[in-house]
Regions:
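Membrane-interface loop-to-helix entry segments
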Residues: 201-264, 296, 319-327, 455-468, ...
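Helix-loop-helix connectors at the membrane interface of multi-pass transporters/channels
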Residues: 153-158, 183-204, 302-312, 317-324, ...
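Helix-loop-helix junctions that connect adjacent transmembrane segments
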Residues: 14, 31, 63-64, 195, ...
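Membrane-interface "cap" regions at the ends of multi-pass membrane proteins
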Residues: 1-103, 118, 125-134, 553-595
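Extracellular loop-to-transmembrane helix junctions
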Residues: 88-196, 200
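C-terminal membrane-solvent junction of multi-pass transporters and transport-like membrane proteins
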Residues: 418-423, 466-533, 557-563
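TM-loop-TM module centered on a large, flexible mid-protein loop between adjacent transmembrane helices
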Residues: 151-157, 161, 271-275, 287, ...
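Membrane-helix boundary/coupling elements in multi-pass transport proteins
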Residues: 127, 148, 171-184, 290, ...
Length: 595
């Protein structure tokens, strides 16, 4: 067998098995219907989540297959994060706060994901891997140590409390699942940028059928689809950044060398609700709220950990790559829109006020039309359509895997653990697709408003998820310190921990409550907005307390946390891993380019 360059780390304590009510569950023994072919291809042990491809349905501890390559993982993280918000919705932030507020807000949000260093024996010392901290860095340290399905949800149960995992898991599941019908209807709206020929129900049916085809078969097909869609997103944002640089220097039909003109007139900052310093601060705060909900990435990377090839080598690099690329895209993207369009642009205001379809409300398209550039708006709209489709595809994957993780730990119905012979949790995927049928509400305009309510209702869930990640890491580190584990032997070690995690926790927690601040301003009280902004903040503790009272769970003491559960399986997989041969020259090129 080929060596991976990773030694099996030696830890100070043996495996702990817990049977008390509040303790972490002991992994079940895998049960495969066709036991004669339990071994996986290329030396994959079945215990590592690569069971047999025979038999129609199997049930066990974790029977997903490790078929996602490094290039898939990296583009999943980027593709799940870059959606229509970076191309279209970012214009609303420009109108609210101005170009400087928008740029500062997106930059500050990236400081909650600053880089820190990884170190894993000689191999990782030779390759300095960096990833965002505190949120992404905290997840990177835990996920690379134990790359399992639905990691941050299951880690919450192992390192904090089972009730905490239930609240976090269903919060994340509802958030991801409810965004699927939103993106499906977005695809229909984007198509209306051209013609209103295809009926809404037909577009919705086609998109849902495509999601089913991609997600109900082997995970490698999801990985391939997301790779190419995300690659298109990357090319689009890079192209738009280059476009901005060219036209600002006069490379446009009007030969207008405008540079940073709009930062001077009408200005770099825009007041919101009030004039003066208070108005400028509220404008910046509104941009900060938008950036907080827009920037993601590590959650999508971590959700693929249980299906990643060679995860202790691939995952640290994926976290590093996703951080730097998203940092560049979001910071330069927020800078670009402020260069192209003034914050008081009448066309941009009218586009959002009238709810114009597709890319019509994109600051880039508004700038193209002002500069009399004809073809590019259609290209942008086509790529925005791809972005919406890809985002919905990612939500189907993440929602189904989060539900699968809940089922694995006994927090969702047992039948949801079943996987097809290709390693797909079929009933979890079907459950998400059933929720996606809500997209047919788009057929009725009034019902479409109700659908938007659902989406707004779970918006705060994202920042709750980020807070959960940071707090879970804090408990994880306490357990490691209490049990004498040497963190330097982990596949990934972050800087400034646990202080970075506390910084991320406090920042995300505060932003969770700030999201609906506008309802508390004089004359701005609105009951629906209040409910949309704060309902999930109330639901989370209700679920947590309810499960805790019913199941009588307890917070895990640092000395009682099971830090070795399933680790031996991962280490055995790493020892026996043999890379699959490249299919062709194109496959070889992209695998090396994203390795």
């Amino acid at each position: 067998m080929a060596s991976t360059g990773l030694e099996t780390p030696s830890y100070a304590h043996p495996v702990r098995h817990h049977n008390n009510t509040g303790a972490a569950p002991v992994p079940e023994k895998i049960t495969i219907l066709d036991e004669e072919k339990a071994g996986g291809p290329y030396g994959y042990p079945a215990a590592a989540g690569l069971g047999s491809d025979s038999g129609s349905i199997k049930e066990g501890a974790d029977n997903t297959h490790r078929k996602l390559k490094a290039r898939h993982i990296q583009l999943i993280g980027i593709g799940g994060t870059i959606g229509t918000a970076l191309y279209v919705s970012i214009g609303r932030g420009l109108l609210n706060g101005g170009p400087a507020s928008l740029f500062i807000a997106f930059t500050w949000c990236k400081t909650q994901k600053q880089p820190h260093q990884s170190s894993q024996h000689e191999e990782s010392r030779a390759q300095i891997a960096r990833a965002p901290t505190p949120r992404c860095g905290s997840m990177a340290e835990m996920v690379t140590y134990l790359p399992i399905s639905s990691p941050f949800i299951r880690f919450a149960g192992r390192y904090v409390d089972d009730a905490f995992a239930v609240a976090a898991g269903y919060n994340f599941f509802v958030f991801e699942a409810m965004l699927v019908p939103f993106e499906v209807t977005a695809c229909n709206v984007i198509l209306h940028y051209w013609e209103n020929v295809v009926p809404a129900w037909a577009v919705i049916a086609i998109v849902l059928c495509l999601y089913a085809a991609i997600n109900l078969f082997a995970v490698k097909w999801y990985g391939e689809t997301e790779f190419w869609c995300a690659l298109g997103k990357v090319l689009l944002i890079v192209g738009l950044i280059i476009f901005t640089f060219i036209v600002m220097l006069g490379g446009n039909p009007l030969h207008d060398r405008f540079g940073f003109r709009f930062w001077k007139n009408p200005g770099a900052f825009a007041p919101l609700y009030y004039e003066g310093s208070l108005g400028y601060f509220l404008g910046f705060l509104q941009c900060l709220i938008q950036a907080s909900f827009t920037i993601a990435g590590p959650d999508y990377v971590s959700m693929a950990a249980g299906e990643a090839e060679n995860p202790r080598r691939v995952m640290p690099r994926a976290f590093k790559a996703v951080f730097y690329r998203l940092t560049a895209f979001f910071m330069l993207g927020s800078l670009a829109v402020g260069i192209l369009v003034p914050h008081d642009d009448k066309e941009l205001k009218a586009a959002f006020k009238e709810g114009r379809p597709g890319a019509a409300a994109s600051p880039y398209v508004v700038a193209m039309e002002r500069l009399r550039i004809s073809v590019l708006p259609h290209i942008v709209n086509a790529m925005v359509l791809t972005s919406a489709f890809s985002a919905g595809n990612s939500y189907v994957y993440c929602a189904s895997r989060s539900l699968y993780g809940l089922a694995l730990d006994g927090k969702a119905p047992r039948f949801l653990r079943k996987c097809t012979r290709q390693g797909v949790p079929i009933y979890c995927v079907l459950a998400v697709l059933a929720i996606a049928l809500l997209s047919f509400l788009q057929v009725s305009n009034n019902a479409a408003v109700v659908l938007q309510w659902f989406v707004n209702l779970v918006t705060a869930s994202q920042l709750i998820n980020f807070s959960v990640m940071c707090y879970t890491f804090i408990r994880f580190k306490k357990a490691m310190d209490a049990q004498g584990f040497d963190r330097k032997s982990l596949p990934y070690v972050g800087w400034f921990q646990p202080f970075a995690a506390w910084y991320g926790l406090i920042g995300c927690f505060v932003m969770t409550f700030v999201g609906g601040y506008t309802v508390f301003l004089p004359g701005q009280w609105d009951i629906p907005t209040f409910l949309f902004s704060y309902t999930m903040i109330g639901v989370f503790p209700i679920v947590f307390i309810g499960w805790k009272l019913i199941k009588r769970t307890k917070f895990h003491k640092p000395l009682d946390v099971d830090l070795r559960g399933e680790v031996e399986e991962i280490e055995e997989y790493q020892r026996n891993f043999v890379p699959a041969p490249h299919k062709n020259a194109v496959d070889k090129y992209f695998n090396k380019a994203f390795s």
